[in-house]
Structures are given as C-alpha cells and as structure tokens.
C-alpha cells in the first residue's frame, strides 16, 4: 500500500517566523505555532508520515552562521521528539535566491526520491506551508497543497480536514443483464434516492440507509422482464463494493455491530468489517414473494453484499408475517452497520494492522 506524506514548511508553519529578519537564530526567537504538536500527533495516528522541508537563506554564511541556526533548531527537534512527533527526514536548502540552486523550494530536488519511488500516495499527500512557494512546490510534485494561516487555515483546521474526509464512493456496474449506478455518503443523512424497478426492494434498501444513518443513491436498469434475480444480486454486489470503498482505510471505525430489535418479529444481526466475506443466514418465509420481491433473493442479496464489502455477517429472523420478517432483516442490518462504521478514534481496529 502506498504511503501518505506531509511535506511541512518550518518557519511560519511549524514555528513562528520573526518578522524583523525572518531568521530563528536565537533561542528567544523560538516559538511554536498554536496547536501544532497535538495536530501532528493526530495526523501521525491517521497514517501520515512527516517530512520537514525548509529554505534557510544563506545558512552557513556570515549573515546566518550555522551555529546560530543549530541551537534553536536542535531544541525544536528535541521538543517535537519528546512529545512523540517524528519526522522521517529534515530537508534544508541553505542557498540564497541569487544562487539559483536546484534545491530551493519550489524546485523538487530535495524531494526527488519520494517522487521516484512510486510508493507515495499522491492523491492523499500534501505540502503544508505559509508561502506561495509551498503551494507551487505541491503543484510541481503533483500533490495537494495547503496554505497555512493562523486565522483561515490553522493547525486544528488542517488536522480536522485531513482526518475527517467525506467518506464517499461511486460505483458503476454494467453487465448484459443490468446497469447499476450506486453512490454512498457515510457521513451524511437523509435525501436517499433509490430506484431499482422493484418497489418493495427499493423500500428495503431505504431501510438500510435510514437505520444505517447514511445517504445513498441507487439507480438500476435490469432485465425485470425475466425476473428480479439479476437486479437484486447485482445491486448487492455494487452496494457492497461502494460501502467498502467509502470506508477507506477503516481507521477509527468501531468495526463491530450487533442488534437484536424486538417487535412483532425478532431479528438478530451481528457484523464484523473484517475483510473476510462470510454470511450466516436463517429466515423462512411462507410465500415466494413479498410485493414484487422474491423472498429467495433476500439471502442472495446479503450474500452478494457481504462478498464485495468484505464483511462477516450473521442474520436471523423469526415472526409470523413475511413483510415484517423481511423488513426486520434490513432494519437490523442498517442499525448494525450504523454501529460498525461509526468513527470513534484514529487507530485501525485490528491487532494485525490491516483490515
């Protein structure tokens, strides 16, 4: 799996930049930007690796002696380390603009190895800095740029933005039998739109979204002139795939869910977002259809969904009325899914380190 990186400017971003001479060359000039340490810890927990990259004009010359730089810089690094903040690398350009070197930001000389290794997740890596040159560096690297500012984009805002993404997925599945378009928003509620051509199935899918606490849009064109088999099966496959993609790296999710709702029907549902697809299903129905949905396809739907989502799912229901029995399964699954996808922290809920 490719690695997420944050390439972070030093002066004006990690620590304050003195407006008088733009040099942190005395201990009394060293001051950390508000909230930087707790947010860097949060970002590390979210899977980011940190790289410091900084232009230090004339470092090592008479105007900026190396010893004057080293004292405050080493103290800064000691403080970061003592609090658990670890930088994989510190990259420094010591040249003046007039030197026309190859390593001064926004040129990419200092970060060439990250670009060459192909191990960097470019879509989810960022340059963070307070100057236009930092944003230009991001563009030159082909990654995202965040312009740090104490008022408009400070460290708490950056931490929130990079660890609380909108968990969204869009899946299109086209076969000779069906054309399916599924969108899911795990962190938004309400406004679901579902049209599979099977009215009762639409109602059941809406139960998943409503009780799962998320929004989805599903549009299906299937070979219903034959029967509902391909429509229900392929919808399960596409929805399971969309849920898996929207969950992303699964950091911070509860992972497990269990509900036992009791009404006219007793339904049990247990779920583990384990990466291991498996279904245990027990339900009996009096009739072959409820509305326009074949009751035998209900198990097939959940089996298809659990396969592409990569979950272990146990479902069981008892009751007298077929409509209520079917509905209890979908409601129970929705409530269980709501528990399992809820984000409560930043760690991956697995001792293996992968889900």
Curated annotation (Swiss-Prot):
| Record: active site | 9, 11
Cofactor note as given: Binds 2 Mg(2+) ions. Can also use Co(2+) and Mn(2+)ions.
| Annotated region (Histidinol-phosphatase), positions in chain | 1-166
Q: Name one GO molecular function term.
A: imidazoleglycerol-phosphate dehydratase activity
The UniProt activity regulation field reads: Inhibited by Ca(2+).
Q: Copy the pathway line from the protein's UniProt record.
A: Amino-acid biosynthesis; L-histidine biosynthesis; L-histidine from 5-phospho-alpha-D-ribose 1-diphosphate: step 6/9; Amino-acid biosynthesis; L-histidine biosynthesis; L-histidine from 5-phospho-alpha-D-ribose 1-diphosphate: step 8/9
For this UniProt record, give its keywords in alphabetical order, as a comma-separated list.
Amino-acid biosynthesis, Cytoplasm, Histidine biosynthesis, Hydrolase, Lyase, Magnesium, Metal-binding, Multifunctional enzyme, Zinc
Q: EC annotation?
A: 3.1.3.15, 4.2.1.19
Database matches in PANTHER family: IMIDAZOLEGLYCEROL-PHOSPHATE DEHYDRATASE, IMIDAZOLEGLYCEROL-PHOSPHATE DEHYDRATASE HIS7
Recorded family membership: In the N-terminal section; belongs to the histidinol-phosphatase family.
The protein here is known as Histidine biosynthesis bifunctional protein HisB
Q: Which organism is it from?
A: Escherichia coli O157:H7
| Lineage start | Bacteria, Pseudomonadati, Pseudomonadota, Gammaproteobacteria, Enterobacterales
UniProt gene name? hisB
